[in-house]
């Protein structure tokens, strides 16, 4: 679940097809002898502009963002960011041995490290820098919990930053995937 994806779609049933499924956060997929933890969400650095554009569209076309199917439409969702869920991590600890993690954003040890583009957006969004810092802290919590619970993590995949990068740290291959970049997991 990326930051520009409607969280309502990720309930495990709204989009469930033979080869593609939108799963809820903290879902563990058991595929090809791997236990894959999926945790989505991230901060949109352009959230202020997205909210303003959606409000203009609603006024111009005279519609509400909640249509008859009950799925909200918008350019920004206030619940887009990731949430650390202690209870779900407790359940995962007792039921699985996680070896692959897929998230939208990444722990603070990973790229992107620079905030050069971020400061430009923060001029009109004073809470942005703190929210992004909190987001990285939340990802660090997730990583630390997985390590404390002795999960044998070998791979961590993420996107969000629209670039490609990888590194091995502490036995984990962290791989940032660019838009439309795919990779094989063995």
What is each of the regions a protein language model found here?
Residues 27, 77-81, 178-180:
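Adenosine-cofactor binding site in Rossmann-like domains, unifying the SAM/SAH pocket
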């Amino acid at each position: 679940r990326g930051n520009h994806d409607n969280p309502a779609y990720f309930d495990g049933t709204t989009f469930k097809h033979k080869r593609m499924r939108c799963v809820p956060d903290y879902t563990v997929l058991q595929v090809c002898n791997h236990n894959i933890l999926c945790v989505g969400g991230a901060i949109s650095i352009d959230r202020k502009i997205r909210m303003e554009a959606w409000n203009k569209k609603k006024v111009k076309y005279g519609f509400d963002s909640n249509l008859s199917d009950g799925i909200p439409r918008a350019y920004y969702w206030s619940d887009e960011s990731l949430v650390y869920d202690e209870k779900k991590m407790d359940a995962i600890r007792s039921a699985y041995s996680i070896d692959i993690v897929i998230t939208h954003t990444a722990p603070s040890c990973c790229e992107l490290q620079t905030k050069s583009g971020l400061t430009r957006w923060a001029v009109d969004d004073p809470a942005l820098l703190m929210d992004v810092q909190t987001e990285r802290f939340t990802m660090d919590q997730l990583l630390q919990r997985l390590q404390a619970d002795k999960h044998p993590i070998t791979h961590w995949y993420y996107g969000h930053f629209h670039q490609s990068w990888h590194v091995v740290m502490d036995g984990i291959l962290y791989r940032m995937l660019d838009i439309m970049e795919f990779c094989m997991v063995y």
